[in-house]
From Swiss-Prot:
It comes from the Bacteria. It comes from Escherichia coli O81 (strain ED1a). GO terms for cellular component: cytoplasm. This is Divalent-cation tolerance protein CutA. The keyword Cytoplasm applies. HAMAP family: CutA. Its cofactor is Cu cation. Binds 1 copper ion per subunit.
């Protein structure tokens, strides 16, 4: 449970997968350099199962967790989509309903 230092927020978490660590690092570096994300967490070793063009696929991927704000999310999604090697990359935006005030302040200050 968050204490009195938690607050409502306009922050969001963006989920994206990449085919390998090098691609994930490149994508993360792009959105960080453009100040569209405050932080990127890269989790290698994810296994994704999905149907693509009628066939069950299984891929080993890197799960990316990117932290940003509502006002930066569209630019981040466009940046990721334009540089991503997948035809249809995973781009999901999850609202952050509450968070630590100090962390959220840092997140906002880290963006352009």
């Amino acid at each position: 449970m968050l204490d009195e230092k938690s607050s409502n927020t306009t922050s969001v978490v963006v989920l994206c997968t990449a085919p390998d660590e090098a691609t994930a690092q490149d994508l993360a570096a792009k959105v960080l350099a453009e100040k569209l994300a405050a932080c990127a967490t890269l989790i290698p070793g994810a296994t994704s199962l999905y149907y693509w063009e009628g066939k069950l696929e299984q891929e080993y991927e890197v799960q990316m967790i990117l932290k940003t704000t509502v006002s930066h999310q569209q630019a981040m999604l466009e940046c990721l989509k334009s540089h991503h090697p997948y035809q249809t990359p995973e781009l999901l935006v999850l609202p952050v309903t509450h968070g630590d005030t100090d962390y959220l302040s840092w997140l906002n200050a880290s963006l352009r």
